[in-house]
């Protein structure tokens, strides 16, 4: 099957109202491909574990026109599509059934390929960064595994939108240190004002790749003040979203964005987040995914 044809079926599957990531994962586990889901009978859908109401949603949605329109829109806007079978996805990510099976992005995904030539000697011994090196000046820090000899380490740096100058300096210093310890590190954040923006900017300044997970379509800049920053992120990394182009910012989208930051990260730093900060949901998701 041609790639565009495959993507059309993924767009169809992820666009079915009432069929979220958990059901999408279930269907793909049983039927293997979204095309097979498209052609499945009601009996087969029920046997796969779908409730009768959800099976009806699938059957009533059998029309690929909308999916083809979205694909064409993505091509015009320079948006790439990435399924959970892409090599950028780790095995650990594929095992989480509440994560999207399809994502939309802007930027340079080829820089995140395991085979990407970054001009870095991956045989060198980088600075070990275990518990004895825990940065005490940060509000919270945790890791999934030791940093030693770990190429393409994904490090989340998140925190308050309204942060102090001291928190800003902590953020910038931490990103710089991450790059010194591991020049192949990938800095992940949420593209928001405050710590998120400083983390992305510091990553770019220190020659690191960076990923911004957003709660809008990847073609939308939120906040608007970050238009220039988002352009830079697209040049030095990726902007990723589970939402199609044209999707506006809704409050409910940001906790969902936070779970992506947490799931994609091997290590996380939380800086300047208050007790009621939304950033703490990112920490909670990290603890969930990395138990």
Regions found by a protein language model. Give the residues of each.
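Glycine-biased, small-residue-rich flexible motifs in mid-sequence functional cores and linkers
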Residues: 1-5, 85-291
């Amino acid at each position: 099957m041609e790639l565009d044809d495959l993507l059309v079926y993924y767009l169809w599957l992820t666009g079915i109202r009432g069929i979220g990531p958990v059901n999408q994962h279930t269907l793909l586990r049983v039927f293997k491909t979204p095309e097979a889901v498209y052609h499945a009978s009601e009996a087969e859908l029920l046997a796969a574990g779908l409730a009768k109401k959800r099976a009806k949603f699938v059957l009533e949605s059998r029309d690929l026109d909308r999916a083809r329109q979205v694909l064409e829109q993505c091509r015009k806007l320079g948006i790439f599509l990435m399924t959970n079978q892409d090599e950028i996805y780790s095995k650990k990510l594929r095992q989480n059934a509440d994560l999207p099976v399809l994502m939309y992005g802007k930027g340079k995904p080829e820089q995140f390929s395991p085979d990407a030539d970054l001009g870095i000697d991956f045989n060198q011994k980088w600075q070990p960064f275990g518990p004895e090196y825990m940065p005490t000046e940060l509000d919270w820090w945790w890791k999934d595994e030791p940093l030693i000899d770990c190429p393409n380490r994904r490090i989340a740096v998140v925190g308050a939108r309204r942060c102090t100058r001291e928190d800003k300096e902590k953020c910038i210093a931490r990103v710089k240190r991450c790059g010194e310890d591991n020049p192949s590190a990938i800095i992940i954040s949420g593209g928001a004002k405050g710590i998120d923006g400083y983390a992305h900017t510091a990553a770019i300044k220190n020659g690191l790749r960076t990923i911004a997970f957003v709660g809008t379509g990847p073609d939308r800049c939120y906040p608007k003040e970050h238009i220039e920053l988002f352009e830079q992120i697209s040049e030095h990394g990726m902007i990723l979203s589970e939402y199609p182009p044209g999707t506006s910012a809704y409050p409910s989208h940001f906790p969902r964005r936070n779970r992506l930051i947490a799931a994609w990260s091997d290590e996380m730093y939380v800086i300047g987040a208050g007790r009621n900060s939304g950033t703490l949901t990112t920490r909670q998701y990290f603890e969930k995914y990395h138990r």
